[in-house]
């Protein structure tokens, strides 16, 4: 169970999953097309036609969410590696997102597959990083809006309060603000073209699927985080902060308690 050779579902179940619409399409292509569909619906001038276009858009997103839920249930019922299934459900709730915010429904199935399920039996540090790199988490907790001079603390607070150390574990508001500054520039971009940057910033740009680190939006000042001094130098600050969080005794206590309660 800890080292499954591969999930082999019964033929009938696998065929049912394979028959689902869009199952073989690249997920971020789907998300980009939905983004465009939503924008087009909002630009319709006639009120009745606009309402109809928005209803079609919402229904299409609901269909995607139901498809993802059906796939999850089929795997939970029929997959032979049940430890992976139970841990996938545990981590999916631990790193939870709300699918009815914005258009998260479109990618919630991919979030479960690539960020959670793929790392459910692995190291916590990798799981934390995988959720950060998925656009669903960044959109849900508003980090796509987090930029130098315009801090949004939602994701930073959630990481410390729920994902790692836990409430009342000794961190301060200053630590939350420092982590929010570290996370500036970490966001989403579904466009194929790169953002316009100054020549000296271009080497710092990172794009992986819909994940983007935009150095023009990052706070490059030094930070003091949980007693550690973090030099302002870009995306590597996030790795340093995550290493600090994952090695903190409060994180071990919080995660161990959550797992013990679940099992």
Where are these regions (language model features)?
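N-terminal accessory alpha/beta regions
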Residues: 1-94, 98-110, 115-117
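Active-site substrate-binding loop specific to GH73 endo-beta-N-acetylglucosaminidase modules
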Residues: 39-61, 65-72, 104-263
């Amino acid at each position: 169970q800890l080292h499954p050779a591969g999930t082999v579902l019964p033929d009938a179940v696998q065929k049912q999953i394979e028959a689902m619409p869009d199952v073989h399409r690249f997920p971020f292509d789907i998300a980009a097309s939905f983004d465009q569909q939503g924008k087009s619906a909002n630009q319709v001038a006639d009120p009745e036609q606009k309402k109809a276009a928005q209803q079609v858009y919402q229904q299409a997103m609901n269909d995607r969410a139901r498809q993802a839920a059906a796939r999850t249930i089929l795997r939970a019922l029929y997959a032979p590696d049940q430890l992976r299934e139970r841990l996938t459900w545990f981590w999916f709730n631990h790193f939870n997102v709300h699918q009815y915010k914005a258009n998260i429904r479109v990618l919630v199935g991919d979030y479960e597959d690539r960020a959670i399920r793929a790392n459910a039996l692995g190291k916590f540090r990798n799981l934390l990083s995988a959720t950060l790199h998925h656009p669903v988490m960044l959109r849900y907790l508003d980090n796509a809006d987090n930029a130098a001079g315009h801090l949004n603390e939602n994701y930073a607070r959630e990481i410390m309060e729920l994902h790692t150390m836990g409430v009342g574990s000794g961190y301060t508001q200053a630590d939350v603000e420092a982590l929010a500054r570290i996370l500036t520039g970490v966001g989403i971009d579904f466009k194929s073209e790169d953002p316009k940057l100054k020549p000296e910033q271009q080497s710092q740009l990172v794009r992986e699927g819909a994940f983007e680190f935009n150095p023009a939006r990052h706070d490059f000042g030094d930070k003091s985080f949980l007693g550690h001094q973090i030099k302002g130098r870009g995306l590597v600050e996030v790795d340093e902060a995550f290493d600090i969080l994952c090695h903190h005794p409060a994180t071990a206590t919080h995660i161990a308690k959550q797992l013990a309660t679940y099992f």
